[in-house]
C-alpha cells in the first residue's frame, strides 16, 4: 500500500477553515508520530484495534458524493451499504464498531452472510443515522487496507524535523532479502540534539535497530555508527522511535541516521519515495542524501543509483 504522510501529518481544527479550500497557513494542533496498517481484510484485527485503540480508517468504493446522492448500493431505510463490484476505492470512512449479527437482508444487494461494521462518514449528520452507517463485512473493499492512528502528540513535541521524503511511503526497495540497511544524511542547525527518528515498517513483525553517525564525512562514515535504539513492531506502518538518550549534534555539521530493518516474508523491506504517477509528480530527488545496503558494508546512493529518496526522518530539540 501507499501511505502518504507529507512532512508529518498535522491535524488542524477544520471548523476554523472550512471543507472546500486548502489553507497553507493551517496551524497544527497535534503531530502524528505513529500509524499502524492492517492489511488483507483481517476483520478480527480491525475489531481488536477498534476496541483497544479507537477508530480505524479504511477505504471503500462509493457511488455517492454527498448525503443527498442517489445510490444503487446504499439503503436509506437501514443506513446500510454493500458494494460487490470491481470499481476501485474512492472514499474513506472510519470504523467505530461492529455487529456480527447485523442481518444481510438489510442491504440493497444481499451479501453471503450477516455481519457489518458501524462506520462514521464525513458528510454530516444528514447522512445515515446522525452520520453513522453500516457496511457489510463482505463489501468489496472494506478493510483491504486499514490505518489506525495510534500516537498523537502535542504540536511542540520537537523543534525541528529533518527529512527528504515529503510525500511519504510511495514504494519499496530491497535486495531480495528480508533484511536491509538504509540511511539518510542531514546537516545540523545550531544548538541541536537528536531526540527521535521515524520510519516505515513495510510489513508485520518488523524488527529494527537505530544507529547514529554524529560526524558524517562520506559513505565510509556509515561504518562508524552507534546503536541508540532497537525494537519490534506488530504491524506495518509509520513509527517514531524516541532515543533513550539524546545525541548532541555539532553545529553546521552533517550527521546520519542508519536503520537496520528485518521484515519477515518480504524481499523489499525499505520504504521509499519516488516519482510513481500523477499523484507523486511533486517528488523532488534533489533534497535528499540517502544510502542503501544489504549488510551495512557496501552502500548505494538512493538518489543516484535508485532515483528515489529514503523514507527516514530525524527529530531534534534545541539545547539552551
Regions found by a protein language model. Name each.
Residues 260-320:
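Short, surface-exposed beta-strand/loop patches at domain edges
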Residues 96, 211-213, 313:
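Conserved hydrophobic/aromatic positions in well-ordered beta-strands
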Residues 60-62, 99, 123, 201, ...:
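Short beta-strand segments enriched in hydrophobic/aromatic residues
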Residues 150-154, 215, 312-320:
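Short beta-strand-to-coil "C-cap" segments at the C-terminal boundary of structured domains/repeats
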Residues 1-116, 125-203, 231-235, 250-251:
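Predominantly the structural core of cysteine protease catalytic domains
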Residues 205-285:
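Aromatic- and Gly/Pro-enriched, solvent-exposed loop/edge beta-strand patches characteristic
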Amino acid at each position: 500500500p501507499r501511505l502518504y504522510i507529507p512532512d508529518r501529518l498535522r491535524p488542524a481544527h477544520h471548523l476554523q477553515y472550512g471543507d472546500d479550500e486548502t489553507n497553507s497557513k493551517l496551524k497544527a494542533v497535534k503531530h502524528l508520530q505513529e500509524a499502524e496498517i492492517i492489511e488483507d481484510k483481517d476483520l478480527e484485527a480491525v475489531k481488536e484495534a477498534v476496541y483497544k485503540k479507537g477508530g480505524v480508517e479504511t477505504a471503500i468504493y462509493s457511488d455517492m458524493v454527498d448525503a443527498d446522492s442517489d445510490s444503487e448500493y446504499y439503503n436509506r431505510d437501514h443506513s446500510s451499504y454493500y458494494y460487490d463490484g470491481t470499481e476501485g476505492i474512492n472514499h474513506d470512512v472510519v470504523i467505530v464498531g461492529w455487529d456480527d449479527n447485523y442481518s444481510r437482508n438489510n442491504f440493497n444487494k444481499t451479501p453471503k452472510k450477516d455481519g457489518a461494521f458501524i462506520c462514521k462518514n464525513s458528510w454530516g449528520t444528514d447522512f445515515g443515522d446522525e452520520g453513522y452507517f453500516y457496511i457489510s463485512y463482505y463489501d468489496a473493499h472494506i478493510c483491504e487496507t486499514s490505518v489506525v492512528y495510534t500516537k498523537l502528540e502535542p504540536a511542540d513535541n520537537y523543534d525541528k524535523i529533518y527529512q527528504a521524503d515529503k510525500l511519504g511511503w510511495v514504494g519499496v526497495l530491497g535486495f531480495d532479502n528480508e533484511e536491509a540497511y538504509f540511511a539518510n544524511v542531514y546537516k545540523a542547525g545550531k544548538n541541536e540534539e537528536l531526540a527521535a527518528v521515524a520510519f516505515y515498517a513495510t510489513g508485520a513483525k518488523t524488527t529494527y535497530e537505530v544507529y547514529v553517525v554524529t560526524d558524517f564525512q562520506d559513505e565510509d562514515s556509515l561504518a562508524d555508527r552507534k546503536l541508540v535504539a532497537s525494537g519490534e513492531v506488530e504491524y506495518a506502518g509509520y513509527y517514531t522511535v524516541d532515543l533513550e538518550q539524546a545525541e548532541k549534534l555539532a553545529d553546521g555539521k552533517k550527521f546520519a541516521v542508519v536503520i537496520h530493518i528485518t521484515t519477515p516474508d518480504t524481499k523489499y523491506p525499505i520504504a521509499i519515495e519516488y516519482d510513481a504517477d500523477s499523484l507523486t509528480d511533486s517528488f523532488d530527488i534533489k533534497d535528499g542524501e540517502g544510502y542503501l545496503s544489504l549488510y551495512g558494508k557496501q552502500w548505494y546512493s538512493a538518489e543516484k543509483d535508485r532515483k528515489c529518496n529514503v523514507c527516514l526522518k530525524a527529530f531534534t530539540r534545541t539545547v539552551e
